[in-house]
Structure formats: C-alpha cells, structure tokens
Amino acid sequence: MASAEATPQQQIDQLKVNAGWDMKSNIKAGLLHHEEMEKKATKTVTEYIEKFADVLEENVLRFLQDNAEMLELCIYMYEQLPAYKAVKSRGILSAKRFYDTYVLRTADGSCYESVSHCFMRIAAFCTVQVLTNSALKITILYLGRDKLFKDLPCSPTMDLFIYFFSPLSHQLVCCATPIMRSAGLRDANLASCFLINPDLSTEKSTTTALLQELTMLLSAKSGVGCNVTSFGVDEKCIQSCVGLINSQVEFFNDQNPRPVSVAAYMEVWHSQIQEFLAVKLPENPSRCASIYQGLCIPKLFFEKFIEDPGQNWYLFKPEKSGNLANLYGDEFRSEYERLVGIGCYADAIPIKSLMFLIINTIIKTGSPYIIYKEACNEHHWKNMEGCAIASANLCAEVIQYPGADVSTCNLANVCLPMCLVTVSNDSHSPLEKTYCGNVIESQAVSGVGFSMPILHAAVEVAVFLVNCAIAGGKCVTPGMERGQRERSMGIGVHGLADVFAEMGYSYLDERAARLDVEIFENMYFRAVKTSNNICRLGGGRPFEGWGESKLRHGFFHWQGWEDVNLSIPITEWEKLSRRCISSGVYNSQFIALMPTVGSSLLTGFSESYYPYFANISSKVSSKEEVMKPNMTFWNRVSKEDLDTVRFFSGDVALFPEPLKEKYSLFLSAFDYCAEKQLARARLRAPFVDQSQSHSFHLKEENVVSARFLKDLILSGYTLGLKTIMYYCKVKKQSTMSSFQCLRDQNKSEMTGNDQGVEPESYIKCTAAGGETSEACLHCQ
C-alpha cells in the first residue's frame, strides 16, 4: 500500500522499521503516535476535570476547578513553545512510553490524559502540597523565580504552579515512575522503593514479615530491598524463604503493567550463604527467577582474601552469630575472631571457594549486587555504631537503615542535557546573588557550555518536588510512615554521556572527569542548601533524627573521603556549614544515582551517569519490540557514512579506522575499561551521599575467566565504593545487543592457579533467559 493511502497506524508501523537509525522516521513516527493518541486525549481543563474527577485527590481536584481558566491559558501558552514540540519529537519509543505507562486513562480506556495535562496534574499536586506546608511555601516564594510566561498575570498560587510546571514540562526535572503516574490521585503511593530489615528468626516472625509487611509493600506496586540475614528458622532452608518472596512477586506481577520485585540481601558470614547463592541459578529446579540477590561484604572478608585466599572463612547461624549483624570495621573483626575462637561457627569454607561461588553466580545470573559494609556505614549521615546497615534497595543506590521500620526511596532526577547552553559573553554572570556556579565552556567544541545555574535551579525544584511527594504520598504501612520522618531523598541524573558528547569529550576524557565531579559537587551543594533554606527561611522543622546527623556539626558527606578536590569556593561550603549548624536541614539524604531507565526513554537521552549502552538497541514490552536509537549519535552521522554505520549496527568499536576516530565519542560502556569506570565512580562518590547503581559492562572475552571479575570486585573494594556492583551485563560478540551475565557453563577445563579463585571453567555466552536487565523501573 502506498504511504499516502495508508492509515496513520500503518504509516507508524512503516516508519518504525527504520526508526533505529533514521531520526526523521523515528521522530515522524512519534509525532504521528502523539497525533493519534491526542484524538482520544483530554482537550481542555474542564474536560479533564469531567473525565478524571473520580480518581483525583480532593484538594487537587478543587485546585483544578478553582484555577481552571488560568490553567487553560497556561497550557495554551506552553503548547505554543518550542519545548512542547521538543517533548513530542523525542521519537516513537518516547511517545509509546507516555501513553502506555504514564498518562491516566479512563476505566474503559476511551479517554487518555494529554501529555500537557499529565505535567499539569503533577504540578497541581506539588502546588497543593506547598500550599498546605508553610515552610515549603515561604521558602519558594522567598527564593523567587522568573516567570516562564512573563505576560501571564499570576497570583502567588499560580506562581507556585508555574514553579513546578515549567521544569517538568520542559523535562529539565523528571519524576520517578510512581510520582509521574500517581501524583494527584487518591491514596497514591509515591515512593519508588522500600527497604526492610525484618526479624526472620522464628516461623511466626518470618510469616508475619513476609506475608503481612512485605505483601502490603508489594501491593503498592513498588520494589523492595529485604535483608534476609536473620533467617534461621528451625533448620529451614533459605530456599524456602526466598521462594516465599518469589511467589509473591510473581503474584503481583500477574497482569501488572509495571513489574515489581524484591532484592534479597544476605551477609557473607551466614551459614546458608552457599544455598542463598544457588537460589537463582539456572540449574536449580526450584529457581527463584523473579527476585534479585545482593550481598553485603565486610572489609574483613576482602582483607583475608587478599592476605591468603586459601584460608578458611567461617560461617555462623544467625542465632549463634553474636552481634556480627550490627557491627562493621574493627568491632566486626573483633566479634568475628571471638566467635571463631570459641568455636561458635557452623561451617568453614576456603575463602577463595566462596569468592568463586559469588563470581559463578554473577556470571550465570547477572547478580548478586555487591555492597561494601564499611563504606555504607562509615559514610552514612549518622554514626552507625551498634546498628549497621547491611542491605540496600532494589537498584542498590539507596543506602538507609530501616531498623524495625520501613525506609523509603523518594526519587527524582535531572535531565543534564537540558543544562547545555550556547555560550555568550555574559554566560559567566550568575543568575542570582547567592552562589549558583557559572557556565563551564567546552574546551573541545566552540560555543557550547554546561550551565551550573540551570543545574542549581533544577536541583532546587527537585528538592521541593520530592518533599511534596513525601508529604502527599500515602504510607501503606505504619512502618513506612515512621520511616518517612527522616525525609530521605535521592536526586539523580540522566544524559551525562550526551553532555560529554555534545561538549566533544569522550567518556573517560580527563576534561569529562572534571566536569563529572563538578556536576555532582554542585548538585549536593544545592540540595543541602535548599534543604537548609526550608528550615532557615521557611521555618521548617528538621527531619526526625537531626540530632544524630553529622550535618548537625557542619560535617558534609565529602569530608569523610580522602583526596577530594572542590570546585565550589571553600568559603561557600563554610557558610553553608554554619547555616546547617544554626538552622538544621529538612532532609537526611540528598543524592542517589539510580538507573533512570524510564526517564531516559521519555527524553531520548542516555541512562543515568553511564556511558552509552549502545547506539542501536531495543525495548521489549508485553505488546511489541521498539527500536531505541542513540539520538545524539544518529543526528551526527553523515549521509556518506550511513551505510557503513548501519552495516556495523552503530557499534563504533567495529568501524574501520577513519570512522572509528570520527565517531569515537560514541563508544559504548562495553568499550571502555571497566576499572576506569569504577575509578570515575570513586571520583564522584564523595558528593553522592547515598550511592550509585554502578553496573559492570563487560565483553564476552572478559568473562571467560573468573579472574577478571575477581579483580573488578577487589578494585571496587580498594576504591571504597558503597555499591561495588549493581548489575553485570555482558555484550555478546556476535550481536549488537548486550545481555546480562546468564551463562551456560560447559566443557569444564579445571586448571590450578594461585590467584585466589577456584579453577576456571569455559563459559559460553547466551542471552539472559527472559529476564529484564534492570530490577525495577519504579526507581527510574
């Protein structure tokens, strides 16, 4: 059928064929999909109220009703801006994502929320929360912001609305999935993820924790990080415990458009650590395929492994483990040695054998995540002596201590490419009287700069947005309500690789490294400053637990790390320190670098702080597979290079030499040295007071040897990273796609070695057996 005679859907299907490499086709397909969906979407605020009044929270509904005329004008003016066209021009995958996942729809599916009204709903929710919280309201109005629509006569209430609507609708600030989908709805949970540390010491406490608390949390359609180290019920096997968790995950994922999961964490001294590592192995007939695993490894394990890989590592039953679970550092060592000395251990295993089991599990399943116990505790916002952290969340970037309560992940992220500007003569002039940084000019591309003032403004909005979500979200259990009193937040980023490429830097370039660290220093500075302003200017009460906070004494997270180079003048840090001591801060934590898969699909930019995953990849849903191009890359590909680039599927590492150099900025994460990526994570770590979802991106040849992974894990330990490994992904040699590390192990070639690992086996790469490469999209 000729294109002119085709239906819109047929045109979209035709265009999708080339969407992976032809940006005109990709953008046109997205625009057509928006056009088709807008036929079924709300056109006016009045219609929106009529269609969705029954699901909107009462105060949000009233706000929309009371301000309908001004909101209508605001939406109209926004839709005349280039920003609106840009949102609709992100490609077919972005368009699909909006309507399949994020916007509201009526129960019968006959009417959808328009994209503009989706942003309106979130901004209206935030405005309502600010109006009911005097500290937030006073602070925002005091700080002030230039109006987006300068000709629009606004009341203070509408000023507050525009304060949120502008960065949201421009996609400068992006929400985590629960906020994007549910802000402004009745009884909505807005937390991305939960952390629990349940008592699993008896049958009764285990069933109470897993069939009541965990069930309620999963019913909120979010992920959970669960510490299972206390499990030791009447000689029951950890397989049954994890199986109980796995069955619940599968139940909640049945017909659920947004999958949830649980990451079960265990400390490596547990007597059932070997059984725990086996619960997800492909050869396990009772394999728990729907959950994820994590290990909390203490400094002592690494020290002993390095000292003598052949020595024993002792394992303990929880009820005979003394106080190991609550200790770290020298106190952990003393307790461990005391227990070994009096013979309280249940078993012993050569430490190199346990390391090999860990690596074997990583190679076959892509996990367990690995967090470093001492780093998590020593760099926490308060002194953790006697109550150690031993787990993280579902994506391993949120580090909190839930105790008997429920810790929560309250997340948002900044789209870093939106901070790129054309450099002009006055680019270095600050936008406000207080410190907000300057525009950093590219040293490789003329006229391009990264605006720290825009970044500061974005982080400030993100702080208020997350606080609105904390205040206005439903707490699904009493433990969650108690945990939210710490007001922990996690502000992340996406599109860092695009920023580097636009500024002419390869990912591991020294100039990129400096900009990388400066970005996160400025983010941490502005987040703490804004949180302090809520107390200092708005009169807000500091979070519960402020008296124990290191910030109470003016001690910043970066001060606990060595070799930190600051770009912000020390006088600014000292001023902020004094203000924190004097007035307090509203939130306990600030920066967490999550994967941001969802946000990057909407904007078309790269995920999180990672290098590019691929220049052509795909996203598979229950409905279809849609190509995901690296739009920054394909917009650079010249017409004469197109055939060659397509022949090699956009894999720059395979290009012939002239083109490889020409497009060297677009190498993938698999092409960069994994150890150097870990070193970069260490450079930004002082300004990331939670953690980073740091994945290993490896090539097939890297994992034929257990030694390579062993060295990476030890490197993460040496660097002192909180999250040494979130996920391990391996790129198959034969395809453009990349896969997590599920492997078939065959043709065992056992060879002795003295490198501290078990004899190596030949490993054949296969695609991950139907699993997603990320644990959960709610964090992202």
Swiss-Prot record:
The active site is at N393, C395, E397. Its EC number is 1.17.4.1. The record marks C776, C779 as: Interacts with thioredoxin/glutaredoxin. This is Ribonucleoside-diphosphate reductase large subunit. Substrate binds at T177, S192, C193, G223, N393, L394, C395, A396, E397, P595, T596, V597, G598, S599. SUPFAM superfamilies: PFL-like glycyl radical enzymes, R1 subunit of ribonucleotide reductase, N-terminal domain. The record marks C193, C409 as: Important for hydrogen atom transfer. Heterotetramer composed of a homodimer of the large subunit (R1) and a homodimer of the small subunit (R2). Larger multisubunit protein complex are also active, composed of (R1)n(R2)n. Disulfide bonds join C193-C409. It catalyses: a 2'-deoxyribonucleoside 5'-diphosphate + [thioredoxin]-disulfide + H2O = a ribonucleoside 5'-diphosphate + [thioredoxin]-dithiol. Belongs to the ribonucleoside diphosphate reductase large chain family. PANTHER family: RIBONUCLEOSIDE-DIPHOSPHATE REDUCTASE LARGE CHAIN, RIBONUCLEOSIDE-DIPHOSPHATE REDUCTASE LARGE SUBUNIT. The record marks Y726, Y727 as: Important for electron transfer. HAMAP family: HSV_RIR1. Ribonucleoside-diphosphate reductase holoenzyme provides the precursors necessary for viral DNA synthesis. Allows virus growth in non-dividing cells, as well as reactivation from latency in infected hosts. Catalyzes the biosynthesis of deoxyribonucleotides from the corresponding ribonucleotides. InterPro entries: HSV_RIR1, NrdE_NrdA_C, RNR_lg_C, RNR_lsu_N, RNR_R1-su_N, Rrm1. GO terms for molecular function: ATP binding; ribonucleoside-diphosphate reductase activity, thioredoxin disulfide as acceptor. GO terms for biological process: deoxyribonucleotide biosynthetic process; DNA replication; release from viral latency. Keywords: ATP-binding, Disulfide bond, DNA replication, Early protein, Nucleotide-binding, Oxidoreductase, Viral latency, Viral reactivation from latency.
